[in-house]
């Protein structure tokens, strides 16, 4: 919505959020797969 105020800060935040979300998803998937394999 506000692209004129922080044009350089938005992409960095989006990249960081995407990276953190990816890491969280990988961690959750790893835990789920490990639980399934161990069971």
Swiss-Prot record:
**Function of the protein:** One of the components of the core complex of photosystem II (PSII). PSII is a light-driven water:plastoquinone oxidoreductase that uses light energy to abstract electrons from H(2)O, generating O(2) and a proton gradient subsequently used for ATP formation. It consists of a core antenna complex that captures photons, and an electron transfer chain that converts photonic excitation into a charge separation. This subunit is found at the monomer-monomer interface and is required for correct PSII assembly and/or dimerization.
Q: What is its main location?
A: membrane
Q: Which Pfam families match?
A: PsbL
Which family does the UniProt entry place this protein in? Answer: Belongs to the PsbL family.
What's the protein name?
Photosystem II reaction center protein L
In terms of InterPro entries, this protein maps to: PSII_PsbL, PSII_PsbL_sf
Query: Oligomeric state and partners?
Result: PSII is composed of 1 copy each of membrane proteins PsbA, PsbB, PsbC, PsbD, PsbE, PsbF, PsbH, PsbI, PsbJ, PsbK, PsbL, PsbM, PsbT, PsbX, PsbY, PsbZ, Psb30/Ycf12, peripheral proteins PsbO, CyanoQ (PsbQ), PsbU, PsbV and a large number of cofactors. It forms dimeric complexes.
- GO CC annotations on file: photosystem II reaction center; plasma membrane-derived thylakoid membrane
Q: Name one GO biological process term.
A: photosynthesis
Q: Which gene encodes it?
A: psbL
- Topology versus the membrane: Single-pass membrane protein
User: Where would you find this protein in the cell?
Assistant: Cellular thylakoid membrane
Which keywords has UniProt assigned to this entry? Membrane, Photosynthesis, Photosystem II, Reaction center, Thylakoid, Transmembrane, Transmembrane helix
**What lineage does UniProt assign to this protein's organism?**
Bacteria, Bacillati, Cyanobacteriota, Cyanophyceae, Oscillatoriophycideae
Q: What sections of the protein cross the membrane?
A: 18-38
Which top-rank group of organisms is this from? Bacteria
